[in-house]
Amino acid sequence: MPEDAAVAGGETGALVLFSGGQDSATCLAWALDRFPHVETLGFDYGQRHRVELDRRAALRQGLTALDPAWGRRLGPDHTLALAALGEISDTALTRDSAIAFARDGLPNTFVPGRNLAFLTFAAALAYRRGLRHIVGGMCETDYSGYPDCRDDTIKALQVALNLGMERRFVLHTPLMWIDKAQTWALAETLGGRALVDLVVEESHTCYLGERGARHEWGYGCGTCPACDLRAKGFSRYLAARAE
């Protein structure tokens, strides 16, 4: 850790969970609009759609080009390897298997404990970097039913992390109560159509890691649950914008 990391971040610095997807890219813009120093963190857990991690550099570069102030605020990027999470997760996100729904209603893309692990490691890194604020793209409004995306889960984890690390971390989830259409609209509010275009072109959401097919909302297979949510949200966003 650089000696001046704590000084650069301090009590007002933020760490953004940054996968390279639409939600995390929007959250990064949200954080850059609010905090004077922002660092990013991605996780490699053997995910099938690892291509999303490869999009992070282009997104970071694009965001700094959109606003000089954002460029000054954007700090280092970090990547942590969590191979063990992939090894114990027999899911469609970590195995070459068809996406389906289980009897309990959860899709087999659910990786048990993923967000719990992500936020715990993020807090450990934030502790070392001297950053108080942790930003994630979890959402309870327009999601696949993942229990670790729920607001109650995040609030409970914030309490546990603060008790376990003797800190006063603040977990921010700016997308928690908005749907995908509103997420696109938030991007426009933060950075205009230029940010929307950046998210369309450079972010990746598709669970299958498909990067060959280009749609008006971005790249992906067009049929997996992630593509479906993104496509429908983009369509509703355009419709609302035209009113």
From Swiss-Prot:
Organism: Methylorubrum extorquens (strain PA1)
Pfam family for this entry, one: QueC
Residue positions binding ATP: 18-28
Nucleotide-binding recorded as keyword: yes
Matches recorded under InterPro entries: QueC, Rossmann-like_a/b/a_fold
Cofactor-binding details, from the entry: Binds 1 zinc ion per subunit.
Enzyme Commission (EC) number: 6.3.4.20
Keyword Oxidoreductase carried by entry: no
Swiss-Prot/TrEMBL catalytic activity: 7-carboxy-7-deazaguanine + NH4(+) + ATP = 7-cyano-7-deazaguanine + ADP + phosphate + H2O + H(+)
Family that this chain belongs to: Belongs to the QueC family.
Coiled coil: none
Role, per record: Catalyzes the ATP-dependent conversion of 7-carboxy-7-deazaguanine (CDG) to 7-cyano-7-deazaguanine (preQ(0)).
Chain segments annotated as transmembrane: none
Protein name: 7-cyano-7-deazaguanine synthase
Alphabetized UniProt keyword annotations: ATP-binding, Ligase, Metal-binding, Nucleotide-binding, Queuosine biosynthesis, Zinc
